[in-house]
Amino acid sequence: MAKKIVSAIDVGTTKIATIVANVRSQDDIEVLGVGVVPSHGLHKGIVVNMEEAKASITESVRDAQRISGMRIDSVNVGVTGRHITSLNNRGVVSIPRDDRLVRPQDLKRVLSAARSVSVPEGKRLLHAIPRYYTLNGEERVKKPVGMHGTRLDVETHIITASVSSVQNLVKCVHSIGVEVEDLILEPLAAGEAVLTQQERESGVIMADIGGGTTDIAVFRDGSIYHTAIIPVAGYQVTSDIAIGLGLPFNIAEKMKKGYGNVTPGLDTSKADEVGIENGHSASYRDLCDIVRSRMEELFELILLEMPTTDYQTLAPCGLVLTGGTANLTGLAELGKSVLRFQVRKGQPLGVGIYGITDILYDAAYATTTGLILWQARNKERSAWQVKRGGILGSFVSLFRRLFRA
């Protein structure tokens, strides 16, 4: 692909990050600038105060423009929240021509058939991602164009979102003079940043533990298989600390980041009492016990969101933890103990992307960098993602028309 400047906004509960990159190819991406500011006006992926959210997004975009030296006119925007739902659906069409040769228009027809699902009122399709194709009900294929058959099937992962929730987010971005070029489900982006191709092929669960939500994605056979959003994440850990130790919320957040450890017995360097500022202190063990308890609960919630209880068959590569809360000391070890299968911390792999190194390998910015990777690889028509446009393009176009009316 030709050199192109692309931008994206990761809109979270605790931070908003705008990233600008020079994309020369899917494996040659230079990050030019990132604007990171505290998030206000959002909760669990949903806009709850339009003016506050708009102000935070404005500040983040301005910082990214200043650092990169580039003007941001359009962006990809990450979408998450409890309103996200998903299912797998199959589409089937016949190949009517005498030569039985599968052509590009046949892929469009079968994908259209797969998208023909009943969507609840107030929701729209966000993504319709082909997982694999079959010809005549036989072997699975990734690229059937040019092959011969009488019947073409596609197994598709369908993701829907609340129209009002997405509309409010798009409106915030549009109101500062920036176009929304595309909407991307955040766990899809995070998966691009932290998962290896082997993990996606063999089967893996990814949990992006952010501030307000834990975004779940299961990958199998090289593509997305299951997605879910859990409204429990880092915010709830901080809230537990504040309530349990009688601390202001901002002090509890600093305590969590500075001393949070789910395996405190392994760290003999910490004093019995830890302090942060303004005379606030707490028992180190009490602090860590609170963090550990909430994380144990979260692991159980992750299992409840799985489509099967046969976890080893579903995900032989285990669980990959990413997001800011994944930086808690000892979290992967706790996960192994609770879940009884492989767990690792998922830092961005940094493959094919370079530039501002302080975020490129930080789990807290997996979604941020992943939004750029998703667009770069999507343009190259990677095996597990559908190209921008179609139903998703109409979703964005609908909002543009509404806001200009």
Q: In which residue ranges do the predicted regions lie?
A:
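A cytosolic small-molecule/anion-sensing beta-strand core signal
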Residues: 220
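A structural feature that tracks compact, well-ordered secondary-structure segments
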Residues: 215-217
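Active-site lining segments that contact anionic ligands and/or coordinate catalytic metals
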Residues: 213, 302, 314-318, 340, ...
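Nucleotide/phosphate-binding catalytic cleft detector across ATP-hydrolyzing
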Residues: 1-15, 19-206, 223-225, 234, ...
